[in-house]
């Protein structure tokens, strides 16, 4: 009986101490945004971040991150987010069939290396990396691909 009382008091004190420590945790502050980044939110809810980089010269990276991943899948949907990620490379409204492949190859880029995506627990990210932006039409096409990927 005495051991049970001692254990009960010990557990109570441990819980009390844990709650006190949890209450003392400082509030997590958001990371500061680099002042060189221009950002905002469009009327449709899309948040954008733009930063100029001088190196590598005449090259740019384009990303679109969607807040969807495997965590949102029901049991009968396992793998759906990853499957849809792959399907985005099989043609889009503005780049039907192998149109994206033809475009990226025409400007010296390769799928997998410069043109890729991944799906994780809570996000799906599409990437166009190290794109030669020597012509405005290339930038326009890269943004159009991101638009198509956004659904």
Regions found by a protein language model. Give the residues of each.
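Mature N-terminal segment immediately following signal peptide/propeptide cleavage
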Residues: 26-65
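Histidine-acidic residue clusters that define the catalytic metal-binding segment
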Residues: 24-38, 129, 136, 140, ...
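Generic marker of residues within folded, mature protein domains
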Residues: 13, 30, 54, 116-118
């Amino acid at each position: 009986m005495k051991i049970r009382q001692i254990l009960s008091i010990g557990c109570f004190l441990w819980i009390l101490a844990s709650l006190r420590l949890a209450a003392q945790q400082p509030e997590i502050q958001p990371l500061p945004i680099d002042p060189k980044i221009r950002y905002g939110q469009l009327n449709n809810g899309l948040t954008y971040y733009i930063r100029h980089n001088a190196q590598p010269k005449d090259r740019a990276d384009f990303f679109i991150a969607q807040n969807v991943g495997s965590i949102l899948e029901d049991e009968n949907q396992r793998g759906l987010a990853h499957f849809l990620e792959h399907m985005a490379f099989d043609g889009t409204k503005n780049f039907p069939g192998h149109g994206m492949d033809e475009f990226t190859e025409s400007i010296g880029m390769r799928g997998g290396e410069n043109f890729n995506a991944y799906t994780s627990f809570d996000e799906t990210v599409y990437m166009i990396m190290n794109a030669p932006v020597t012509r405005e039409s290339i930038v326009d096409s890269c943004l159009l691909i991101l638009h198509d990927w956004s659904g």
